[in-house]
Regions:
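Beta-strand-rich assembly/attachment modules of structural machines
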Residues: 2-165
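Acidic, glycine/polar-enriched metal-coordinating patches/loops
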Residues: 341-400
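Acidic, low-complexity/disordered segments
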Residues: 1-23, 119, 126, 142-143, ...
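Short alpha-helix capping/helix-loop boundary micro-motifs
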Residues: 61-77, 319-321, 360-368, 496-504
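Short coil-to-beta-strand transition motifs
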Residues: 98-108, 375, 517-528
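Short coil-to-beta transition motif at edge beta-strands of beta-rich domains
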Residues: 77-96, 328-335, 503-518
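Charged- and aromatic-enriched interaction segments used to assemble
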Residues: 118-287, 586-590
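Exposed extracellular interaction/assembly regions and N-terminal maturation sites
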Residues: 304-354, 386-390
Length: 590
């Protein structure tokens, strides 16, 4: 995949659209990644697929005609055997230089016996997939008769005091290097939303103040015998939403990173070029996959200490917890039955250790009035931070006994309609109070995309309920709300898509921004490539791409980035002029 497409690349593609001349280069690698042979083949047929939504990102199959027949025997010492890997590239002939320009297709492992040779047609069939197959148990990666544990922290065996919290990124690196023997990797930080520079201008300050917790394993992780290396890696990846893992095509580096937002990315390929190589267009939408509400049920919260003895006076919850001694300890989780609803900036005091504030984990802001409901059990996590060389203790609200959050895709307009609940109360349809009541969920967030065809106001409620499995790793309502927003965004963006077929474009990759004007529209829009399929027999590329809807609100007028409203609050709306809001609602770019 070329990071920058040159004019030469575009000219070669345009020339090949009418008279394609291709050559496949296969380098055979040993277990150390060293080249031990080379097969230059003429392509009879074959295909390659790249799917940004799949753990196995790249697969390929080829029917080729080798030039050196002695290298294709299926024997232990041949170039096509179980212990061999291959690195492939495809060459397009450049009439100007009278030579081939090669584009990398990545490194692969054989997924069947290794290949079949047909003496009648003199053809070789190769089926393969990327190196994730070495981690998922297909070729390697299944672990033997042992239980693997990753504790959340190390503690003093005598006192039980926490010595060190274990970091998610370090656990991923340890898994790769010790269990898979992969040292060629690039692992980015995995952690809390507000600790990421993509989402918070003050991310460095947040990391400093939450040094012990922002990127640490939230609870002990244990994996049974027979699991795969990939299943362990996925568990750590999915502790927080919006991360991906894959092997890149250039150097076969294992990469773990946030899914690119593409906010500030330049257009990789523009509409004018795509129109010149366009063959067909398909805008079919699979309505069975459309969802506009995501409801996430997370972890059933297990607390270290619990008490039903609690009073509420002067906006302070005072509780006595037997066995909780001496002082607040960093990382302790506490369950308390709340006697009364709270006012703004509520505080808590346990065993007279001192009054501390109650905060939301997602934004580090004090909880708002009526966040805590009477006679409900809530869990809090104690966190100590170093601020100006002093310890600052806060209680972070994890949620009720089971983590629960909802995200709703809406156009942000009031319905003006009312429905009556079983207890006789009226609620405005699709209001926050409506969803809180009828979904029995306190944490309800809205994603507002004014021009989406899939909002609840247009299609009604189509829920996507996430429960069990990886969602049991979500440890607070705030984290569940982040995950619900991410899942709902995927649901709406992946259904608002288009598939086009073009002349062969071997330099493409997923998560790239392009501009394109649909045949039934008079305007260009920005899209993100989600999957690619190359057909080397017909010399075509099929591209599936989804409409670019930013996940989080951001103003980048100087970048020309398409804008939508992602939060429905006065504070956000006040950032825009009346003309800008009109442009956003109509789908224009700022």
């Amino acid at each position: 995949m070329a990071e920058i497409i040159t004019q030469e690349d575009l000219l070669i593609v345009l020339q090949h659209a009418s008279n394609p001349i291709l050559k496949l280069n296969i380098e055979v690698l040993d277990s150390e990644g060293k080249i031990i042979g080379n097969l230059e083949c003429g392509i009879q047929s074959g295909s390659m697929s790249i799917n940004g939504q799949s753990d196995i990102r790249r697969t390929a199959n080829f029917v080729v005609q080798p030039t050196l027949k002695e290298k294709i025997k299926l024997t232990e010492n041949s170039l096509l055997w179980l212990n061999k890997d291959i690195r492939m590239s495809v060459g397009l002939y450049n009439p100007r230089t009278k030579d081939y320009k090669y584009y990398p297709l990545g490194c692969y492992v054989y997924t069947d016996t290794s290949g079949t040779y047909d003496t009648t047609t003199d053809n070789l069939t190769i089926n393969c997939a990327d190196f994730m197959k070495k981690l998922d148990g297909t070729k390697n990666g299944q672990l033997g008769a042992l239980i693997i544990s990753y504790p959340a922290y190390k503690e003093n065996e005598e006192t039980g005091e926490v010595i060190e919290y274990n970091i998610i990124r370090n656990a991923v690196i340890e898994t790769l290097e010790k269990l898979a023997r992969i040292t060629n990797h690039r692992i980015d930080d995995i952690g809390e939303f507000y600790a990421m520079p993509e989402y918070n201008d003050a991310w460095e300050q947040y990391r400093e103040e939450n040094a012990d917790t922002w990127n640490t394993i939230p609870f002990d992780q244990e994996f049974s015998a027979g699991c795969s290396v990939l299943s362990i890696l996925i568990t750590f990846r999915d502790l927080y939403p919006n991360y991906e893992m894959f092997f890149d095509m250039e150097s076969n580096t294992f990469i773990c990173q946030m899914v690119p937002s593409c906010y500030e990315d330049d257009i990789y390929i523009d509409n004018s070029f795509l129109q010149r190589v366009l063959i067909s267009e398909n805008t079919t939408v699979d309505m069975t996959t459309v969802r506009n509400i995501c409801e996430v049920w997370g972890k059933v919260i297990e607390v270290d200490f619990y008490s039903e003895e609690c009073t509420y006076t002067n906006n302070i919850y005072s509780s006595t917890i037997p066995g909780y001694e001496n002082e607040y300890f960093n990382g302790d989780s506490i369950g308390i039955k709340i006697p009364s609803a709270n006012l703004d900036n509520a505080q808590i005091s346990i065993n007279d250790f001192g009054v501390i504030g109650i905060f939301n984990e997602a934004n580090d802001e004090p909880i708002k009035a009526n966040t805590l409901k009477p006679n409900e059990i809530y869990a809090f996590k104690i966190k100590k931070k170093r601020v100006d060389k002093q310890d600052v203790v806060k209680a972070y609200l994890l949620g009720q006994w089971q983590v629960h959050a909802i995200n709703v895709l809406t156009n942000g307009k009031k319905s003006g309609k009312f429905v009556t609940s079983s207890d006789g109360e009226e609620y405005e349809l699709y209001s926050k109070e409506y969803f809180q009541k009828f979904y029995n969920c306190e944490r309800v967030d809205f994603t507002i995309i004014a021009n989406s065809p899939f909002v609840v106001e247009k299609l009604g409620e189509i829920p996507d309920i996430k429960v069990s499995g990886e969602f049991e790793n979500i440890t607070s309502n705030d984290l569940a709300a982040d995950r619900a927003k991410w899942e709902n965004w995927k649901n709406c963006r992946l259904t608002d898509n288009i598939t086009i077929t073009t002349a062969l474009l071997p330099f493409l990759d997923v998560n790239k921004k392009v501009s394109y004007k649909r045949s039934d529209s008079d305007r260009e829009h920005q899209y993100i490539i989600s999957s690619i399929s190359h057909d080397f027999a017909s010399y075509t590329t099929t591209i599936t791409m989804y409409r670019f809807y930013p996940l989080y609100e951001m103003i980048l007028k100087e970048k020309g980035t398409h804008k939508v409203l992602s939060e429905f609050s006065h504070g956000v709306l006040s950032k825009y002029t009346h003309e800008e809001l009109a442009a956003i609602v109509s789908g224009d770019e700022l």
